[in-house]
């Protein structure tokens, strides 16, 4: 259930009447009744609430006389600002705890009362530009409000000043600065009202009104920032830091910053409009809708309509007024600086592309006169190169849309350098990688062994002699060590080539290690360990026989010509084994010899089955 204002007013009046009647019934006289009311906290709370209700009723009466019915935007702004002012008042009560009294509370309520009329006057003057009809009653109301507010602000500022001089520093400093800031607001509202009045008297639109409004806002915000700064300094010297003035001080600084930026950006936009935006011709106006969306009037060639970077056309004077507040297109809200920066970025990109092409040509010319990098190893590594022609695209080439093809990519091997020795040409090029399962790294065969040229009487077997750099001229050496763009690009390209070579070598070593299996060394029991070890039991022999087949997949060093049984295995073994048997049979025990024969028979039988 929502409590209405009428119910609150009626309840407050009834509670006040009951409180006063109770005091007179108890004390029977006027003076004792007043003392009783002033000493009772409950009675004073009821009287305070009744005073707030009376102030609210007076505000509603003056509002209806001076402003009439409020618009929705005005009521919303008034409500928001009132809540902020109430919170700031509560913070001010905490700062001035020693000066807290009934008079102090009444002064803050009166300050809030006058602030509300300042806010309403500001919003109502701003509505003048958007109102189609301005009546004589509106002018009478506004002039009355501005005169009354100016007189009240001046009176309270002078009262606070003289009170501070005669009685010393007190809470009156706060009220003096608050009314001084309100007086600056009255001055701002008066300037806007006069500018709007002058604009309404002219039959045509006044182009310079926005300029004056912008400079007036900058001037008033500067005054407010100076007042808040001076107030903070005085409060720090006299009392303490004014915490309740932080929010309005921040808002004033931000408004000053915004006004300063608006002045700069508006001047830049107007200069750009006069110098860079083209004037639309009569043929273009005839081929399009010639209605200006700002003023809703027909555009003609005499009015010099301007075309924005987004291709929308408006009156020059309409754009001048529009650019005073914002630098966007009135139709599509495109930032005019963004469009200009986009065009400039396109030109810069074209220039950069041309510079890169020139740098590549210059780098190629510089690299052509240098000796090849590692001529003996250049053919051993594959470099991903783009084949000539669109028809020569390989399966691993980039697909449409700029995405790389499926892995593995096709590798194109760079040709061998022209100054390579002849015996290096006999080495065949590395074969293509063997196909493997999809998604796996391609299997590379081991690198081919270098073939030695057996031709006699040729001098190609000697390695090439390193080139002599003493024949280079001073100009060529300076070009090689230069700090120009072309030299830096050539160095970066050489570093990239080195990285590609290193990565290719690492890749081939990984592939070689993956393809080549690791051959485990066969464990052959030594003679000394067999002599010292006691005869194994049947369980140990069985466990050893179970462990031996686990390594049967690895290649063995024992070879046989034909499968044989365990009884004939010793006779078909290698000569080394046969020759070693008679020499060790005399030193081994029969049990150890039997174990040895079983092991040899087991190994030879598995190799024969493989």
UniProtKB/Swiss-Prot annotation:
| Gene Ontology MF term list | ubiquitin protein ligase activity; zinc ion binding
Chain spans, region Disordered: 386-408, 452-480, 521-610
Q: Tell me the compartments it is located in.
A: Endoplasmic reticulum membrane
What Gene3D superfamilies does this protein's entry cite?
Answer: Zinc/RING finger domain, C3HC4 (zinc finger)
Q: Does the keyword ATP-binding apply?
A: no
**Which parts of the sequence are RING-type zinc fingers?**
292-333
The pathway it acts in is: Protein modification; protein ubiquitination
Alphabetically list the UniProt keywords.
Endoplasmic reticulum, Membrane, Metal-binding, Signal, Transferase, Transmembrane, Transmembrane helix, Ubl conjugation pathway, Zinc, Zinc-finger
Its GO biological process annotations read: ERAD pathway; IRE1-mediated unfolded protein response; multicellular organism growth; proteasome-mediated ubiquitin-dependent protein catabolic process; protein ubiquitination; regulation of gene expression; regulation of Notch signaling pathway
Q: Which reaction does it catalyse?
A: S-ubiquitinyl-[E2 ubiquitin-conjugating enzyme]-L-cysteine + [acceptor protein]-L-lysine = [E2 ubiquitin-conjugating enzyme]-L-cysteine + N(6)-ubiquitinyl-[acceptor protein]-L-lysine
Q: Which residues lie on this side of the membrane: Lumenal?
A: 24-41, 121-144, 192-215
Record note on disruption phenotype: Reduced growth rate.
Compositional bias, Low complexity, is annotated for 560-589
- The domain of life for this entry's organism is Eukaryota
Q: Which residues cross the membrane?
A: 42-62, 100-120, 145-165, 171-191, 216-236
Q: What are the boundaries of the signal sequence?
A: 1-23
The record's annotation in InterPro entries points to: HRD1_E3_ubiq-ligases, Znf_RING, Znf_RING/FYVE/PHD
Can the keyword Cytoplasm be found in this entry's annotation? no
Domain commentary: The RING-type zinc finger is required for E3 ligase activity.
Q: Which family does it belong to?
A: Belongs to the HRD1 family.
> Function of this protein?
Acts as an E3 ubiquitin-protein ligase which accepts ubiquitin specifically from endoplasmic reticulum-associated ubc-7 E2 ligase and transfers it to substrates, promoting their degradation. Component of the endoplasmic reticulum quality control (ERQC) system, which is also called the ER-associated degradation (ERAD) system, involved in ubiquitin-dependent degradation of misfolded endoplasmic reticulum proteins. Also promotes the degradation of normal but naturally short-lived proteins. Protects cells from ER stress-induced apoptosis.
**Per its record, how is this protein called by name?**
E3 ubiquitin-protein ligase hrd-1
Q: Which organism is it from?
A: Caenorhabditis elegans
Taxonomic lineage of the native organism: Eukaryota, Metazoa, Ecdysozoa, Nematoda, Chromadorea
Annotated gene: sel-11
């Amino acid at each position: 259930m929502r409590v209405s204002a009428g119910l609150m007013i009626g309840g407050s009046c009834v509670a006040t009447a009951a409180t006063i009647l109770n005091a007179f019934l108890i004390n029977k006289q006027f003076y004792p009744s007043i003392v009783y009311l002033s000493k009772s906290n409950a009675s004073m709370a009821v009287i305070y609430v009744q005073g707030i209700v009376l102030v609210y009723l007076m505000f509603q009466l003056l509002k209806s006389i001076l402003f009439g019915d409020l618009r929705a935007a005005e009521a919303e702004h008034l409500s928001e600002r009132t809540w902020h002012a109430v919170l700031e008042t509560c913070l001010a009560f905490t700062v001035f705890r020693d000066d807290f009294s009934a008079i102090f509370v009444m002064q803050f309520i009166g300050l809030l009362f006058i602030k509300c009329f300042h806010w309403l006057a500001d919003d109502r003057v701003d509505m003048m530009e958007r109102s189609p009809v301005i009546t004589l009653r509106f002018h009478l109301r506004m002039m009355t409000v501005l005169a009354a507010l100016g007189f009240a602000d001046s009176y309270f500022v002078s009262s606070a000043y003289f009170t501070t001089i005669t009685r010393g520093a007190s809470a009156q400093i706060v009220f003096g600065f608050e009314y001084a800031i309100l007086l600056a607001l009255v001055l701002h509202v008066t300037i806007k009202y006069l500018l709007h009045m002058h604009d309404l008297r002219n039959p045509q639109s006044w182009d310079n009104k926005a300029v004056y409004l912008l400079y007036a806002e900058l001037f008033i915000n500067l005054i407010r920032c100076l007042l808040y700064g001076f107030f903070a300094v005085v409060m720090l010297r006299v009392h303490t830091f004014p915490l309740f003035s932080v929010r309005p001080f921040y808002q004033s600084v931000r408004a000053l910053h915004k006004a300063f930026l608006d002045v700069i950006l508006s001047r830049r936009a107007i200069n750009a409009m006069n110098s860079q935006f083209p004037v639309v011709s009569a043929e273009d106006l005839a081929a399009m809708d010639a209605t200006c969306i700002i003023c809703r009037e027909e555009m003609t060639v005499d009015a010099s309509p301007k075309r924005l970077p987004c291709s929308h056309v408006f009156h020059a004077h309409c754009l001048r007024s529009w650019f005073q507040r914002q630098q966007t297109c009135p139709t599509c809200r495109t930032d005019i600086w963004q469009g200009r920066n986009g065009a400039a970025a396109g030109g810069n990109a074209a220039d950069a592309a041309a510079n890169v092409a020139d740098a590549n040509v210059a780098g190629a010319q510089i690299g052509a006169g240098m000796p090849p990098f590692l001529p003996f190893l250049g053919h051993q590594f594959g470099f991903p190169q783009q084949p000539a022609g669109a028809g020569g695209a390989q399966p691993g080439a980039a697909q449409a849309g700029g995405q790389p093809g499926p892995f593995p990519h096709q590798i194109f091997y760079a040709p061998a350098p022209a100054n390579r020795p002849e015996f290096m040409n006999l080495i065949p090029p590395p074969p293509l990688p063997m196909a493997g399962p999809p998604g796996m790294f391609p299997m590379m065969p081991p690198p081919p062994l270098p073939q030695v040229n057996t031709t006699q009487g040729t001098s190609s077997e000697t390695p090439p002699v390193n080139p002599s750099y003493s024949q280079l001229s001073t100009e060529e050496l300076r070009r090689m060590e230069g700090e120009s763009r072309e030299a830096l690009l050539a160095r970066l390209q050489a570093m990239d080539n080195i990285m590609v070579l290193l990565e290719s070598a690492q890749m081939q070593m990984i592939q070689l290690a993956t393809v080549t299996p690791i051959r485990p060394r066969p464990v052959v029991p030594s003679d000394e360990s067999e002599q010292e070890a006691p005869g194994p039991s049947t369980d140990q022999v069985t466990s050893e026989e179970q462990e031996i087949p686990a390594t049967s997949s690895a290649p063995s060093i024992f070879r046989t010509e034909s499968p044989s049984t365990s009884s004939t295995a010793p006779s078909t073994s290698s000569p080394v084994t046969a020759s070693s048997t008679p020499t060790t049979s005399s030193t081994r025990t029969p049990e150890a010899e039997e174990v040895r024969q079983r092991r040899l028979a087991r190994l030879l039988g598995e190799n024969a089955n493989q």
